[in-house]
Amino acid sequence: MARSVVVALLVLLSLSGLEAIQHAPKIQVYSRHPAENGKPNFLNCYVSGFHPSDIEVDLLKNGKKIEKVEHSDLSFSKDWSFYLLYYTEFTPNEKDEYACRVSHVTFPTPKTVKWDRTM
């Protein structure tokens, strides 16, 4: 019985140590298809490699939050870091600017990454 108590304590200690590890998210913003003005497309924001899992992701049009956004389920990699995909349908043009804003404990303020239509 003493052995099982020791094993249980070691497991709890190792799990509590996971919460202390923090990794900043990598943010990638891209369209599903090459951008063509006036042609419907999908804007994607792929956020990966972050820990802990608490995160807030917003897609922006001209600095304002886009309301109709969908996302994948929160998933994790082999290294226990997390990843998510946020996406929305949009129609690019010359005047509108699109971006992805991410809030995470590893950032002192939210980080915004602009969509580069040439990518």
UniProtKB/Swiss-Prot annotation:
Family classification: Belongs to the beta-2-microglobulin family.
GO biological process: antigen processing and presentation of peptide antigen via MHC class I; immune response
Descriptive protein name: Beta-2-microglobulin
Keyword check for Disulfide bond: yes
Disulphides: C45-C100
Subunit structure: Heterodimer of an alpha chain and a beta chain. Beta-2-microglobulin is the beta-chain of major histocompatibility complex class I molecules.
Gene: B2M
Protein source organism: Lagothrix lagotricha
UniProt signal peptide: 1-20
Chain's role: Component of the class I major histocompatibility complex (MHC). Involved in the presentation of peptide antigens to the immune system.
Keyword field: Disulfide bond, Immunity, Immunoglobulin domain, MHC I, Secreted, Signal
GO cellular component: extracellular region; MHC class I protein complex
Cellular localisation: Secreted
Record InterPro entries: B2Microglobulin, Ig-like_dom, Ig-like_dom_sf, Ig-like_fold, Ig/MHC_CS, Ig_C1-set, MHC/Immunoglobulin
Domain Ig-like C1-type per the UniProt entry, residue ranges: 25-114
The keyword tRNA processing appears for this protein: no
